């Protein structure tokens, strides 16, 4: 089957949607926005050489080689997938080099300005090699599809893989991304490195984060101050369980200037400067706890803005509001909104 994406035309054994599966070079159509954003990120940051560490069909590396000025290496451990990538590189007249070896072995032979980690499942086994294989002040792009562990929906996986406790509730996807970044930060610190999150996205079945990697134990020490525990009971009493979750990343999820430029160029609508705030107020949770109906979310956001507060929707919940106001005030304004719309 022939698939066209961006400037590439590749041969694939099958087209797949969803979290992916093991197999020779399957093409995941749901990851197109992931690849679009990656290409715009590479352009924006002026990256000159790239390792696509998990080649699959070769679509990511081929698109990068054709749509940016970067030199590209594609690595793939599967011999069958390697042959498929090599054929697709030739089909596209791409200058990408293709290596039939493991991700870790490729990184032992040289460092890259940008390393892309997009494996089947969890990125955890590959993070140390990736962090060590990035050049000074280089970049990592990491995809995680192991949401059952990151969101706490399978608690023993969360404990074993990420050494953390996460409650599977309304906040699970924000906590999942913060757990992923926090784990990356811990691994970086252990290697004398530190990271700065530049873009963080939840898109369906996967999380995608881009970070800058720097060296130095002093910087690592400062970075580790962003790790800690979250107790949602403090958001709004009487709704959320009194328990400490984490450790997770409590710092910024993105560099607003980088995220805005990259996501706009990629045609992605998710940029929101308020996403850096830790957690949000969820109107569905409040309505359920107070046994009332759900108001129009935009009316509550308008009321917050009129009160002088920053407020916006969040990618993590269709009824969540990121704001500098307390959730107590959000609840009060929500009730006012409901009363105003009620018939006299």
UniProtKB/Swiss-Prot annotation:
- Supply the InterPro entries for this chain: SAM-dependent_MTases_sf, Trm1, TRM1_arc_bac, tRNA_met_Trm1_C
Q: Where does S-adenosyl-L-methionine bind?
A: 35, 60, 76
Give GO terms for biological process. tRNA N2-guanine methylation
The catalysed reaction is: guanosine(26) in tRNA + 2 S-adenosyl-L-methionine = N(2)-dimethylguanosine(26) in tRNA + 2 S-adenosyl-L-homocysteine + 2 H(+)
Which Gene Ontology MF annotations are present? tRNA (guanine(26)-N2)-dimethyltransferase activity; tRNA binding
This protein's UniProt keywords: Methyltransferase, RNA-binding, S-adenosyl-L-methionine, Transferase, tRNA processing, tRNA-binding
Q: Give start and end of each Trm1 methyltransferase domain.
A: 1-334
Q: Which PROSITE patterns match?
A: SAM_MT_TRM1 (PS51626)
> So which domain of life are we looking at?
Archaea
Q: What is its EC number?
A: 2.1.1.216
Q: Which residues form a coiled coil?
A: none
Q: What does this protein do?
A: Dimethylates a single guanine residue at position 26 of a number of tRNAs using S-adenosyl-L-methionine as donor of the methyl groups.
The family note in this entry says: Belongs to the class I-like SAM-binding methyltransferase superfamily. Trm1 family.
- Full protein name: tRNA (guanine(26)-N(2))-dimethyltransferase
- Lineage of producing organism: Archaea, Methanobacteriati, Thermoplasmatota, Thermoplasmata, Thermoplasmatales
As recorded in Swiss-Prot or TrEMBL, the protein's gene is named trm1
